[in-house]
Amino acid sequence: MRVGLLFGGRSGEHEVSISSARAIASALSAGENASKYEILPFYIHKDGRWLAGEAPQQVLKSGAPLLESSNSSPAENNLVNSQQQTLERWQSPSQVAEVDVWFPILHGPNGEDGTIQGLLTLMQTPFVGSGVLGSALGMDKIAMKMAFEQAGLPQVKYKAVTRAQIWSNPCVFPKLCDEIEASLGYPCFVKPANLGSSVGISKVRSRQELEDALDNAANYDRRIIIEAGVAAREVECAVLGNDQPQASTVGEITFNSDFYDYETKYTAGKADLLIPAIIPDDISRQIQNMALQAFAAVDAAGLARVDFFYVEATGEVLINEINTLPGFTATSMYPQLWAHSGIPFPELVDKLVQLAIERHNPSH
C-alpha cells in the first residue's frame, strides 16, 4: 500500500511538521510495516511549492527545510506552485495517482484547519485524521469553545474579539479592554484563534500587557480569544478511533516557564511529560470520558489529543482544547501516551492508516 506522506507547509510550524514526518516515515518502515507500506513523500516548500521526487527525500533525510533559493527538484516534480494552483497540475504527476492513502502531517493554518482535508476529500482518496468540519473546529479556538459549550463540557471563561475591534477605532479599544478586565480579570491569556503550537500567545497581568498582547495577536489573526487564567495542573489525553474511539492513559506536562509556549513545547528538556499523571483514578476516568465527548463534539476522526486543566484544590476538571493533528516528534505527547497505553509507535501509525481506509469505505 502506497502512503502519501504530506509535510512541510507555509505555516510557522514547518519545522515541527518535518520532525513529525521523519518519525512517521521511520515508523512506516519499521518491522511488519516495512512489507505493508511504501512511502511516497510530498513536501510543501515554505514558498508554497509542492514537491515530489528527490526533494522530499532530501528533507526527510536531513531534517532541515529546503532553502528559499533551492531548485533541487526537476520541473516535472514541481506539482503545484503559488502562481498556478490547479487541479490539472495535480492530476498529471504519476506520484499523486499512485497514492492509496494520504497521511497529512501539516501543522497549523492550511494544514490542520480543514483546507488540505478539503483538497484530499475532492481527490476521493482516504486520508488520516479528521475531515473538513472536525479539522476546522479543532483549529479555530472560538468555534471549538462554542462546540464544547454546546456539549456541556466545563471550561474557563473566555471572550472573543476581532482584529477590527482592536485596530479600527481607538475610542472603542479602551472600552474593550475594560470589558475584558471586568469579565476575566488577571492573569489572562490572549491567543490568535487559528494558530497552533502556542504561536502568538501572551500571558498578561496588567492593562499595558493586555493592550500590547491584543495588538500582537491581531498581527497573527483576525479573530482573537482571551481566556481567564487558572491555577491548575495541565493534563492531556490521547484519542484513537473513528465512531468508537478509545482514550489513552492520562499524562501531565510540567514546566518551569511562565506557560507552555512554543519554545517549551519543542525544546528537549524544557518540559517534562509524566505518564501516567499522578492523579486520583476517578479524575483520570473523568478526563478520559471528557476527551471522548470532546472528540465527538467537534466530529473528529482518527486521532486527537485533548488538553485539560485539573484544579487540584477543588477537584475540578476544565477542558482547554482539542488538537486534531497533534505532533509526532520525539518529544510529542500523543505517541508517548499511546506507547504507555500499550500501543507502540509503529503499531499506532499502522492503526491510523487503517482507520483512514475504514472511514473512507464504511461497512454495515
UniProtKB/Swiss-Prot annotation:
HAMAP family per record: Dala_Dala_lig
Protein name: D-alanine--D-alanine ligase
Keywords: ATP-binding, Cell shape, Cell wall biogenesis/degradation, Cytoplasm, Ligase, Magnesium, Manganese, Metal-binding, Nucleotide-binding, Peptidoglycan synthesis
UniProt binding sites for Mg(2+) 1: D307, E321
Annotated Gene3D superfamilies: 3.40.50.20, ATP-grasp fold, A domain (3.30.1490.20), ATP-grasp fold, B domain (3.30.470.20)
Cofactor note text: Binds 2 magnesium or manganese ions per subunit.
GO biological process terms held by the UniProt record: cell wall organization; peptidoglycan biosynthetic process; regulation of cell shape
PROSITE patterns registered for this protein in UniProt: ATP_GRASP (PS50975), DALA_DALA_LIGASE_1 (PS00843), DALA_DALA_LIGASE_2 (PS00844)
Intracellular or extracellular location(s): Cytoplasm
Pathway annotation: Cell wall biogenesis; peptidoglycan biosynthesis
Principal cellular location given in the protein's record: cytoplasm
